[in-house]
């Protein structure tokens, strides 16, 4: 088993070190991750400049690009052998509901969708690393079990882990994505020379976070697993759109 590990918090982040440590005695692991924090990079690719991989003292590969860049190169010639699966994380911070649209953690896993093994994205619901051992243990268990999992092609699992010690985790729930409310307005700032700028506000609170959602599961102390696919087609809208388009051309 060959696993490519990436993230969006950066190659020196504690989460990716914990994930590598949890998997390195189970599989042949390669780490390719951004040289700096790329949270919110989504599935962006760097197309305006060359990418320069650098191997660090611990063997991790640092790349001056996005999480998707890292996985794309890892699957297309940077590594001596093609990985069997991609594992992303462990992100310090939730990737719930609408977060998956922006998340570099989820995007890195999605870039591995063409492989035979199901890719997984792991996120811990905390900006602090105290409960990374919990997340690392759960990641190991799920990766070990992946060999007996058969899912439709191009399915990725988005895993969110409550910020709790392992003994307080109540179990695992399969969930759908909830939805967040609209984020607050950006914060306007002015530098000492009078130039205006803006800080993007934090994500909105859960607007659709009832039973069955990823929000509800983690708030109840359960690990949330949401299967994702790239197809965002809203089939239920076809009937209304057919009527709307009739006679336009």
Swiss-Prot record:
Domain of life: Bacteria
Keyword annotations: Cytoplasm, Hydrolase, Metal-binding, Nucleotide-binding
Localization (cell): Cytoplasm
UniProt cofactor note: Binds 1 divalent metal cation per subunit.
Catalytic activity: a ribonucleoside 5'-phosphate + H2O = a ribonucleoside + phosphate
Top EC group: hydrolase
Residues that coordinate or bind a divalent metal cation: 8-9, 39, 91
EC number: 3.1.3.5
UniProt xrefs under InterPro entries: SurE, SurE-like_Pase/nucleotidase, SurE-like_sf
Cofactor: a divalent metal cation
GO molecular function, one term: metal ion binding
Coiled-coil residue windows: none
GO cellular component, one term: cytoplasm
Matches recorded under NCBIfam families: PRK00346.1-3, PRK00346.1-4, surE
PANTHER family: 5'-NUCLEOTIDASE SURE, 5'_3'-NUCLEOTIDASE SURE
Annotated family: Belongs to the SurE nucleotidase family.
Main function: Nucleotidase that shows phosphatase activity on nucleoside 5'-monophosphates.
Protein name: 5'-nucleotidase SurE
Organism, as annotated: Pseudomonas putida (strain ATCC 700007 / DSM 6899 / JCM 31910 / BCRC 17059 / LMG 24140 / F1)
